Design a protein with these regions (language model features):
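Intrinsically disordered, low-complexity regulatory segments enriched in Ser/Thr/Pro
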Residues: 41-95
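Negatively charged, low-complexity tracts enriched in Asp/Glu with abundant Ser/Thr
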Residues: 1-40, 69-76, 80-83, 100-140
């Protein structure tokens, strides 16, 4: 069975060059968090356990799951994939990113606004690192 870190590396490799990817590896749990296009393309939590109450990630890959789950109690659906559906999760993430890019008249400006907003924010953005550049973006 693939580990959480193996799955995170696989997702990053498959999405390389398609979206900007920021990664945060939790220090107290076996979880990896990925945000795409400064959060405009949503986020992915990869873990071997259920998450903290109040923290909602649009996409989740949980290594102990056996089948796809969808939570619809909030404003947006949240998807829970078993590890063998990682490619489905990647396809769903890219479908959402493509939809968002079509929604914004100037996606590059929206990206810049999101980037500026995250500067100095505590939590994820304080500790995450840019691991893959997106379309037309290189990792500095």
């Amino acid at each position: 069975m693939a580990t959480v870190k193996d799955l995170a590396a696989y997702v990053c490799d498959k999405l390389a060059g398609k979206v900007l990817i920021h990664r945060y590896d939790a220090y107290s749990t076996n979880s990896v968090y990925l945000k795409f296009d400064y959060g405009l393309g949503n986020s992915l939590r990869l873990s071997d356990h259920t998450g903290k109450a109040g923290l909602n990630y649009r996409f989740n890959i949980i290594t102990t799951l056996k089948s796809l789950g969808i939570e619809t109690s909030g404003e947006y659906p949240r998807f829970y994939y078993p590890p063998d559906m990682v490619d489905k999760a990647i396809a769903d993430i890219m479908e959402g990113v493509t939809e968002k890019r079509g929604r914004y008249r100037d996606y590059e400006k929206a990206l810049e606004t999101a980037r500026t907003r995250t500067k100095g924010e505590r939590g994820f953005w304080e500790q995450a690192r840019l691991v893959k550049g997106g379309e037309g973006h290189d990792v500095p």
